[in-house]
């Protein structure tokens, strides 16, 4: 057990992205701000000029928004990143040879704390959304088909991989959601170009093992918000100029941590007996070294920004 509070005097909160989105919409509604939903063909344009704008279609009608700056918060598959010229942008990527099969179940979680399991059959994770909604994952091959996994098959495999005390007490039930997601690490540099600033998954992706995706998006927003505040209130562009550097410094540390968590707790197809011994030793060291636990804990709760 890694006591995050004792090791860092901080804690983590399980804050599902659905709930985050709901809360943000409620705040925006109270502020009477305008959100344009169901926009199509969104495209930032002229971001290398003093008059950038964004075009999009709404109900078949083309619209145009003039602006000072553009924040590209449109995710990994969004259009914003492609606006940066190929001669300027550089991408770094690691695709992992497995995925996560996850289910959402209207059952009480097996534990109030997250359980990470390294098993001969592969990784497993016991998580939660709330006291009546559980989220569980198991590692599967990339070519696995979701149709091959009945609820019962999933529960049987999960129980094999979890510690005995958890497997014996877990409450099973019908899944209300089931999916398989690939794992990858991805970073693009720079995270800004002229009047365009990439935020969150538009600029970087981490495997979910380290629980850093949303945490990184929030720190990007913090850096950009601080830069925008200085730009408009103090009329200085230093924050905007340094946005990419500041954000990437924290991004790469989270990329490293998520990579380490993934390689430590997953089984790789090409894993040799030597690799297995190294992995076993890594976990044993983590179990017995307070120094190692502190390194994991301070990264898991999120590095400062």
Role assignments for model-derived ranges:
Residues 211, 226-305:
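C-terminal helical "tail/cap" subdomain of flavin- and related membrane-associated enzymes
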Residues 13-18, 148, 215-218:
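Short, solvent-exposed loop/helix junctions and linker helices
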